[in-house]
A protein has these predicted regions:
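Gly/serine-rich nucleotide phosphate-binding loop at the start of the catalytic core
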Residues: 1-74
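N-terminal-biased segments
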Residues: 4-7, 156-160
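Short, conserved catalytic/metal-binding motifs centered on acidic residues
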Residues: 41-42, 56-57, 102-116, 144, ...
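Generic structural signal for well-ordered alpha-helical scaffold segments
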Residues: 43, 92-95, 171-178
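Short secondary-structure transition/capping motifs
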Residues: 45-49, 58, 62, 76, ...
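Active-site-proximal, Lys/Arg-enriched surface segment
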Residues: 66, 71-148
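Gly-rich Lys/Arg/Thr-decorated short loops/hinges at beta-loop-alpha junctions or inter-strand turns
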Residues: 150-156
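An internal, acidic/charged active-site-proximal segment
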Residues: 157-220
Length: 220
């Protein structure tokens, strides 16, 4: 018997996401001008729109000055490595148990977000690739995900820096997937991962009993 489904409206999704993320990434009020509620509204809209803090501050009404919001975000967030760990724990906490019961078809994707600005602290933050939308500079991240009963579940997430060896990215995503209990029966790779080091890694893994790694294009 299929479990019952119910449709959530945008307000319910927003409240649920805020409550759950606050448990794993506790933010705090910044002075008197930026409350926890405001911070999460800004961060969730920015993430949902795959946009910038600047664009969100221009779009939402009733916010403090953009620079004040920016300072509040920087004051509340932990360092980059700790932020990744907390968000990965949050993501893993809501994976269906069924994903851990048997090996899954795991798809690995490389996402490039065009970026026209400068790096924040380290030049390797900005990835270089074939020009798109008028730039060859991107913020890049890689994901490993499973499609289960028509829903996509991201089981591993990793930022990709300029100069990163793609085979190391694949290896790290598979390691993350195993750490949350999801083991691949088959790995499908986006064509962005078609590189000599990745192919060599795939060949080296094909004889292992622990998993099977096959190269397949996720896009034309």
């Amino acid at each position: 018997m299929r479990p019952p489904h119910r449709t959530l409206n945008s307000h319910q999704v927003h409240r649920s996401a805020t409550r759950y993320l606050q448990e794993h990434l506790p933010l705090r009020d910044y002075k008197r001008s930026v409350t926890i509620r405001t911070l999460w509204a800004v961060l969730l809209v920015t993430a949902a729109e795959v946009g910038s803090l600047h664009a969100t501050c221009q779009w939402l009404d009733g916010l403090p000055a953009e620079e004040t919001v920016r300072q509040a975000v920087y004051a509340c967030l932990p360092d980059y490595a700790e932020l990744q760990r907390r968000l990965n724990r949050a993501r893993a906490g809501r994976l269906p148990k069924a994903l851990r019961r048997r090996r899954q078809r795991l798809a690995i994707d490389l996402t490039l977000i065009p970026y026209h600005g400068e790096h924040f602290r380290d030049p390797t933050e900005v990835y270089r690739s074939k020009a798109k939308d008028g730039t060859s500079h991107f913020h890049a991240y890689a994901t490993a995900y499973v499609v289960h009963r028509g829903e996509r579940y991201t089981v591993a997430l990793l930022p990709v820096r300029r100069g990163a060896a793609l085979a190391d990215v694949v290896r790290a995503l598979l390691r993350q997937s195993r750490s949350v209990g999801v083991k691949p029966a088959l790995v499908l790779l986006d064509r962005g991962f078609y590189a000599v080091d990745v192919i060599r890694y795939g060949v080296s893994q094909s004889s292992e009993q622990e998993r099977t790694l096959r190269l397949n294009s996720l896009s034309d």
